[in-house]
């Protein structure tokens, strides 16, 4: 997050290499290919908010405002609010200009290299006013901004913020999110690499905590209060790899997905498609795993990367796969076994989502409940394997200090063996990643605990899934060789080598792919020497 010792350095980067780095970041996070494959997905119709901490520019003690000219947007797009009042003009008397706010805005909605360049409105708030007068107010007012970017922190836990204070901050944000369907996307902080360094408000249950990819400075989970998995996701940053500047990329992606959901790209149930639980599940499920990604079960996510590196194109394609309900719902005694049922139905797509409710028993009958999603994971290549990514998200309910216990299970239907599961007792995200899944029929289960101690009998959740097998093809094209692979899923790089004998020296200096008919295509000159190719996700 914002660090006074980095302020001048960030300004220099912004002035000299920021544009180039931002354009490269759009490639990495899937924005470039999304714009090639879709029409007008740019955040249109979505209102957003950007509360900012004082940056101290020009010696001001009230420096938090975006300068519209510096993000290439009109003044009419903005409203500015602080304890000194509100204004729709710029400059104004309620605050002063902030270079930090400009850098955040450029990644969020700025032209030309922001993610959501056509948002409907930006509410720019002074950070203390935003928390004191909106988030923690009684009752809190509805700002009507479904996406809120927060590139600030309250401080490190427990050295600057006590665990009790962190929990109160989390509750204030979670209550607001549950009440108004507002997605708070917050930087995790730059206190890494020590574990437990994620700072509020990125620690709240119902929001998304964002790390910075490519730096050891990014804060690392789990949370200090009860060991929850945070951050949820990462992205690169510009003008520096700090979470202040990675966070607005995720916020922009959320605005784009909400726009897509509301315009019907994910099906007729537009309210479910744009719900914050669905958007969060899709963002996490579309993330690309770094080579050293790992989690430590029962924690669902990597303590450094969360679900991985943001890729909004992958998330969009899963949204576009449509909403598909469970095949069958069953109940079992509390703590009882819940193998596949043998139901004949099948979810019709290997990439998609659902927004549903699971109801277990509390009183007078106590029982666990399971929603079953059956998939036939196959293709035309008999020996190929699949990569499965599965994400379950639900809210901490308004006014509650705890959460309902939901889990994810993946069973092989042929033998009822458990393939993988995610069973955290403290997280409201469950996550399964299986990189080499054999072909077959599988039962993906959303399980909800019953019993006397549950928060409520029913819980609404969002589920996103992706099963893919990346097929690399080669064909002769005149005097050349054409190498191709599907545009979706994104995040792969073509590598080549002339000799497979270890240690094989794979290289990546191939021509950039050209997208043709939803395929990445690379044209190479034919040679008499052996050449071997593979797809690699860095």
Can you describe what each PLM-predicted range is?
Residues 301-404, 462-469:
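Secreted peptidase-domain scaffold signal
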Residues 10-18:
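Bacterial N-terminal signal peptides
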Residues 275, 280, 371-375, 409-415, ...:
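C-terminal edge strands of extracellular/lumenal beta-sandwich accessory domains
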Residues 469-538:
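Short, composition-biased motifs enriched in small/polar/acidic residues
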Residues 401-428, 507:
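Surface-exposed beta-strand/loop patches in noncatalytic accessory domains
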Residues 53-58, 113, 191-192, 214-215, ...:
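Acidic glycine-/aspartate-rich tracts in secreted/extracellular proteins
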Residues 23-133, 141-148, 156-161, 178-183, ...:
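Subtilisin-like serine protease catalytic core
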Residues 1-9:
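Bacterial N-terminal signal peptides that target proteins for export
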